């Protein structure tokens, strides 16, 4: 069944093995800062490419996507924009939150992700 196939993917293990677990359990400030630098390439613009899909959707799909985007854009409150929240995190870590500031430090997988999201949005 579909539940059996997806069951293992949808349940987080008690002891994680991913990056978030590493940062929580063993990570140092330098690790968090390096992670934020990489993620800044995506998170400082995160909702914009997704919004480009709205004109291509209709009905329930469009309404659902618009609801997600409403949250991404802070539910109408500028201080709650997800990109703003990430910029605040970067500032708290002593990092420059200017979009694209760390482009030259971006690793290949992150650059692929950012470019792919923009291409799919177009």
For the regions a language model picked out, list residue spans one by one.
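Non-heme di-metal
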Residues: 1-122
């Amino acid at each position: 069944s579909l539940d059996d196939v997806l069951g293992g993917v949808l349940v987080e293990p008690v002891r994680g093995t991913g990056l978030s677990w590493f940062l929580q359990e063993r990570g140092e400030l330098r690790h968090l800062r390096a992670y934020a630098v990489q993620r800044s390439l995506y998170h400082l613009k995160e909702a914009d490419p997704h919004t480009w899909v709205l004109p291509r959707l209709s009905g329930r799909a469009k309404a659902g996507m618009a609801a997600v985007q409403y949250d991404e854009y802070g539910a109408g409150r500028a201080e709650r924009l997800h990109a703003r929240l990430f910029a605040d995190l970067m500032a708290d870590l002593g990092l420059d939150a200017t979009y694209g500031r760390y482009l030259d430090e971006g690793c290949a997988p992150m650059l692929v992700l950012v470019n792919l999201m923009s291409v799919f949005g177009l």
